[in-house]
Amino acid sequence: MNSIAVVDYGMGNLRSVSKALEYVDSSAVVTVTSDPETIRSAARVVVPGQGAMPHCMQALDDQGLRESVIEAAKNKPFLGICLGLQMLFEESEEGNIRALGILPGRVKKLESTDTADSDIPKIKIPHMGWNQVHQTLEHPLWHGIDTDTRFYFVHSYYVATDEPQIVAGSTEYPVPFTCAVARDNIFAIQFHPEKSHSAGLALLSNFLKWTP
């Protein structure tokens, strides 16, 4: 049975993620849960999230979910979305806090260029809307999705890593930043597949078929 735990720590539109997963595989059993044992017993785990990293890490600890999320990221197909990507890294500039430390790197703030200089592209924060994702790593979750396909973003921070071998996708705003990472059983993305129409649904479908 393809059982998927969507981790509920109180941040993000979990219903839209779970409905998208059910749409791409009607036979899948999708459970939105804050129960560590349900997360441990699931075949696959999805960690969405939208908001501030300090609140995210505090919520994981308050609900006793830190260890079950770490275990899932080490042992089973794991999809991180937005904050679910950022929490995997070592630390965040947002609140200068430690994150889970599963992947090497740091969460950094996007730089605004909202100036009067006409030669500088006006870049406002948060980065919100559709943008191209350039695939930098061949991976099963990109199957059937063309490189430079547009996905939907809502974020003010991004992940920076010194290990290029884990970078699976990049986006420009206006400088390039990492928007997807992959290592072993982990695939994590800055954009929102549940808001990204057919491309997002294709990625979620690929995740449900993935056997790392």
From Swiss-Prot:
Pathways per UniProt: Amino-acid biosynthesis; L-histidine biosynthesis; L-histidine from 5-phospho-alpha-D-ribose 1-diphosphate: step 5/9
Source organism, top-level taxon: Bacteria
EC annotation from Swiss-Prot or TrEMBL: 4.3.2.10, 3.5.1.2
Annotated Gene Ontology cellular component terms: cytoplasm
GO MF annotation terms: glutaminase activity; imidazoleglycerol-phosphate synthase activity; lyase activity
Positions of the Glutamine amidotransferase type-1 domain: 3-212
Annotated catalysed reactions: 5-[(5-phospho-1-deoxy-D-ribulos-1-ylimino)methylamino]-1-(5-phospho-beta-D-ribosyl)imidazole-4-carboxamide + L-glutamine = D-erythro-1-(imidazol-4-yl)glycerol 3-phosphate + 5-amino-1-(5-phospho-beta-D-ribosyl)imidazole-4-carboxamide + L-glutamate + H(+); L-glutamine + H2O = L-glutamate + NH4(+)
Stored InterPro entries: Class_I_gatase-like, GATASE, Imidazole-glycPsynth_HisH
Record localization: Cytoplasm
Keyword field contains Hydrolase: yes
Gene3D superfamilies for the chain: 3.40.50.880
Sorted UniProt keywords: Amino-acid biosynthesis, Cytoplasm, Glutamine amidotransferase, Histidine biosynthesis, Hydrolase, Lyase
CDD domains: GATase1_IGP_Synthase
Biological function: IGPS catalyzes the conversion of PRFAR and glutamine to IGP, AICAR and glutamate. The HisH subunit catalyzes the hydrolysis of glutamine to glutamate and ammonia as part of the synthesis of IGP and AICAR. The resulting ammonia molecule is channeled to the active site of HisF.
Record text on subunit structure and interactions: Heterodimer of HisH and HisF.
Protein name per the record: Imidazole glycerol phosphate synthase subunit HisH
Organism: Nitrosomonas europaea (strain ATCC 19718 / CIP 103999 / KCTC 2705 / NBRC 14298)
